[in-house]
Structures are given as structure tokens and as C-alpha cells.
Amino acid sequence: MPTSPGLTEEQRSDLMRRLATSAYKRGNFTLASGRQSEHYVNCKPVSLSGTGLLLISTAMLSHVEDQSVAVAGLTLGADPLVSGVAVAGSLAHRDLDALIVRKAAKGHGTGAWLEGPLPQPGALITVLEDVVTTGGSSLKAVNQLREAGYVVNRVITIVDREEGGAAAMDAAELELISLFRLSEISAFAAELNQ
């Protein structure tokens, strides 16, 4: 099992265990994409816990492009991720801002799609995601950022469900980096339940 840069093998195993026990469920589920699945992954119980967010943020930070000035993601799943990675960056003496992409423009005031300290147009931003299935949520965030004049080349996700998201990212000229694949987490969960 390869080690995610930024995490020791022990830390990676700890994060995998947390995801397998607190984020992963097996049953019959309807996903955000509308697809039916026997696997469900909700990373919020892990990303909203102190140690879980620290592990995720450390791993994600190691994949953020060196020239990136900010991390961004679609609310709600990416909210703790962008904050956690920005803080991890600061602790590592790396200045990164956090941006939240709304699902719809703000209905009052400025009508903003983006929240946070906005960098200059043309700046490189890395998109963070909790779970990628078809890539729709990530692409919505990427499209809003690109329309605002930012450059986005990479999406980092905690879990790739391996259901077409990587191909969708590739078609949008994006590199998808996943900390874990669903097949890894489901196999680990099965081992724990034996």
C-alpha cells in the first residue's frame, strides 16, 4: 500500500480505519449523482473530527501545487477541507487562502458565488473534494472558479468512488488525485468486519 506524501504509513492506516468505520456504509443508497449504489461514503464524520481533519489536511496539502495561492471547494463537503488545508499550510509556513464555492449565487448583497479572500484573476487555485463519483460537484466548483478568471488544473479528493470521475476530470483538462479509492476502503471495512 503506497504512502500518501505528507502522512506516515501509520497515519495513512489510521485515516483509512477512520474512513472505513465512520464514513463508509454498505447497503442500498441513492447518491448525489442520482445513481444507485451498495456503497455509501460520507466523509463528514471524519473531516469534522479534529484528528480526522488533521490527517486529511496533511495528506491533501502535500498534493497542492507549489504555485497555488488558494484551495477551494463546493460547499458543504469541502468546507472543512479548505479550512483545514489552509491552516495546515500556515503551520508549514505556506501561505494558502481558503475559498468556498456556493451551490448557487448569493441571493442578496453582492450575489457572490465565491466566499473568502479572493486572489487576483489568473491565480492558480487547487480544488478540494470529499468524495468524487461522476465528478459533477467538483466540476461545478472548477467551472465557477474558471469563470471568475482563475486557473484550476488539479482536484484532490479524499475518496474516488471509481465511477467515472477521473474520466470526467480528464475531459475537463484536470488532474484528479485521490487519497483513497473506494475499493481500498470497502476492502478494509470488509477485513474489519470479519
Swiss-Prot record:
Q: Which GO terms describe its molecular function?
A: magnesium ion binding; orotate phosphoribosyltransferase activity
Q: Which cofactor does it need?
A: Mg(2+)
Q: What's this protein's name?
A: Orotate phosphoribosyltransferase
EC numbers on record:
2.4.2.10
Query: CDD domains of this UniProt entry?
Result: PRTases_typeI
Q: Which Gene3D superfamilies match?
A: 3.40.50.2020
Q: Name one GO biological process term.
A: pyrimidine nucleobase biosynthetic process
Superkingdom assignment: Bacteria
**Which reaction is catalysed here?**
orotidine 5'-phosphate + diphosphate = orotate + 5-phospho-alpha-D-ribose 1-diphosphate
Question: What family does the database annotate?
Answer: Belongs to the purine/pyrimidine phosphoribosyltransferase family. PyrE subfamily.
Residues reported in the UniProt entry to bind 5-phospho-alpha-D-ribose 1-diphosphate: R102, K103, K106, H108, E129, D130, V131, V132, T133, T134, G135, G136, S137
| Residues that coordinate or bind orotate | T133, R161
Quaternary assembly = Homodimer.
Q: What is the source species?
A: Synechococcus sp. (strain CC9902)
Pathway participation? Pyrimidine metabolism; UMP biosynthesis via de novo pathway; UMP from orotate: step 1/2
Q: Which NCBIfam families match?
A: pyrE (TIGR00336)
Function summary: Catalyzes the transfer of a ribosyl phosphate group from 5-phosphoribose 1-diphosphate to orotate, leading to the formation of orotidine monophosphate (OMP).
Q: Which UniProt keywords apply?
A: Glycosyltransferase, Magnesium, Pyrimidine biosynthesis, Transferase
Known InterPro entries for this protein?
A: OPRT, Or_phspho_trans_dom, PRibTrfase_dom, PRTase-like
